[in-house]
Amino acid sequence: FLTMWDHCCGWEEEFRHFRPEPSAVRPWTGYVQPYTDTPLNRETVGQSVYLNMISKARKYIYITTPYLVIDVATNTALCNAAKAGVDVRIITPHIPDKRYVFEVTRAHYPPLLEAGVRIYEYTPGFIHAKNFVVDDRFATVGTVNLDYRSLFLHFECGVLLQNNSQVTVLRDDVRDTLLKCREVQVSDCHTGLLGTVLDSVLRLLSPLM
């Protein structure tokens, strides 16, 4: 937020006084690494964190995201993980906040489902969480949606956890959330020639989302 604020205002503010004093930092297990992502450079930090976590998975990948409007690299990484035997589960909303983005999200389901990725829609309402949990070892929570705007155009931030006690807390939260979801089947997606063409057109619109 401060990076965006300074950019819009033309300032160069000193951020160090916002950071806690060393004496205020409590002992903790594992690692907690905050990160930021900005469109002001060519480094897509948010996407790099996600792809790195996917590549390290050997047992499971749990993802919660309000939007699933992904690029080829992320789609390929998730499909390859599922094909390699990793339990890949993605939670998205069943009740959308934006109907057109919801349709584009669903257009991304078929290739993932066919590769073995399991997709769940949260039925009680809209879900806005953005997190990854991998193998009880890694987790990230932040503002980074799985869509083009968030990954490539917006100012975002998050925190990466490794071998930290909160990783399993997040895992348990995802598993509890899965109990409130309906699992999506291939038969729930657009079928036939018209449906396939419609999904292809919607995926072409992904960079605008």
For each predicted feature, which ranges?
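Charged, low-complexity intrinsically disordered terminal segments
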Residues: 1-209
